[in-house]
Amino acid sequence: MKSLNQLHLCKALSVFLFTLSVNSQVTTIDRSMQEQTMLSVLYAQSSTEYVANCIQTYSGASLILDEAIADKEWTASLEQSGDYSSKAMAIILDVDETVLDNVRFQARAILSGLSYPNGWIEWGLEASAEPVPGVSSFLENASNKGIKIFYVTNRVAELEDATRENIKRLGLPFDDDRDVLLMRDENGWGSDKVSRRALVAKDYRILMLVGDQLTDFISLEEAATDIDSRRKLAEKYSDMWGKKWFMLTNPMYGKWEGAIYGNKYPDTKEEMMKMRLDALKP
């Protein structure tokens, strides 16, 4: 009888341990790929150097404003054409990591083991992003000088209301007399921002462009190339940087990563890891 009870006990213990093991496997979060971005996210979230770089970028842009206003031949847009000297003035900014700081979303992705686009829409709908350091004073300065502020973003149109709410909640300039928030998927617009910049250029002289990706300044076609060619693009437009174009540092994501994979993201983590390692130059 004692042996039988011991047998039942052993069986019950085995079932319990198996169940515990299965549950553990189910709830274990695979963060292996997300953790590769951890240092870049921590840099953006906790380093003084990142904050200083953002403030430096926007302070530099503010110092150029009066010169840009005075020079009627001044334009920052490659899409600008014809006689624009008498047009009203505008500045175009990207939104994410340029105006709105989404580093908390990136932190969530690491902790949850999920990767973009999982959770992105939900984050956007919260409308709780904080401003990128330096942007508030820059935009206040520009707005006070009579410059129209346009936000050109590749957030999907579903997030338009929440994005507007977020920007207004931060007290940033946001005019309601015309559409100043130009979303992807709105009016048939795709990811390339050329057509949206051209739309603004019809009525405004564009003084500056501000963003964190090459495509905030040039066409998607020109920017979607290999690593070496992208580096040459920085040199090609060397007379624009820090004068008419202002780039924010974003080590967390962007087309720069796509260039590592030949602009075609691999299907497996193993292949992605290999391509990342192959891109390193010791």
Question: Regions from the language model: what does each represent?
Answer:
Residues T28-R31, S59, E160-P282:
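C-terminal cap/substrate-recognition subdomain and adjoining C-terminal extension
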Residues Y43-A52, I121-S128, F150-V156, E186:
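Second-shell loop/turn segments in exported
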